[in-house]
From Swiss-Prot:
CC terms in the record's Gene Ontology section: extracellular space
Lineage, uppermost ranks: Eukaryota, Metazoa, Chordata, Craniata, Vertebrata
Protein name: Somatotropin
Organism of origin: Labeo rohita
Residues holding Zn(2+): 38, 189
CDD domains recorded: somatotropin_like
Function of the molecule: Growth hormone plays an important role in growth control and is involved in the regulation of several anabolic processes. Implicated as an osmoregulatory substance important for seawater adaptation.
Signal peptide, first to last residue: 1-22
Molecular function GO labels: growth hormone activity; growth hormone receptor binding; metal ion binding
UniProt family annotation: Belongs to the somatotropin/prolactin family.
Length: 207
């Protein structure tokens, strides 16, 4: 009888520990989603403010050239839409999100120079760093002690100074930078929301 009680106690403690970990992971997931949503909103505001200050002829020029431009994230293999994202594993979505955020470590410093508001510039750098750290913890949680077999996570992106070496003029370069930042934050928000929704196992979870 005593042995049965001990075993029951061990099982209950284990369940409580696992529930605690699950709760912590869910809070972290919710936190990273909120952070990337804020970054996406910030990116949208920045590009709108930039556009509002353009001269009509500059706006017409950019409308013709920017759709043909590439972002450094185009070198990162990723789902092209929500449907494809929903078919990807949670770990894959987290890894791609990490890679996308990582691609802005250098570019965010360049991005900060295009923003006149120093508070906004600081917010970008801090939130990108926090987001990268949070996603890294979630990836480790998904691996659950298993080795990370995705060697591509540690490979440098091609053309790390991509946004510095383009032959665009300053106006086009700045607009491209803002447009790419908005596009990438939209991607990360989509991937993290899909991953979080899948993890919650909530049938009412909406994307």
């Amino acid at each position: 009888m005593a042995r049965a009680l001990v075993l029951l106690s061990v099982v209950l403690v284990s369940l409580l520990v696992n529930q605690g970990r699950a709760s912590d992971n869910q809070r972290l997931f919710n936190n990273v989603v909120v952070r990337v949503q804020h970054l996406h909103q910030l990116a949208a505001k920045m590009i709108n403010d930039f556009d509002d200050n353009l001269l009509p002829e500059d706006r017409r020029l950019l409308s013709k050239t920017i759709p043909m431009s590439f972002c450094i994230s185009d070198y990162i293999e990723a789902p092209t839409g929500k449907d494809e994202a929903q078919r990807s594993s949670m770990l894959k979505l987290l890894r791609i999100s990490f890679r996308l955020i990582e691609s802005w470590e250098l570019a965010s410093q360049i991005l900060s120079r295009t923003v006149s508001n120093s508070l906004t510039a600081n917010q970008i750098n801090e939130k990108l760093a926090d987001l990268k750290m949070g996603i890294s913890v979630l990836i480790k949680g998904c691996l659950d002690g298993q080795p990370n077999m995705d060697d591509n996570d540690s490979l440098p992106l091609p053309f790390e100074d991509f946004y510095l070496t383009t032959e665009d003029n300053d106006l086009t370069k700045n607009f491209r930078l803002l447009a790419c930042f908005k596009k990438d934050m939209h991607k990360v928000e989509t991937y993290l929301r899909v991953a979080n929704c899948r993890r919650s196992l909530d049938s009412n979870c909406t994307l």
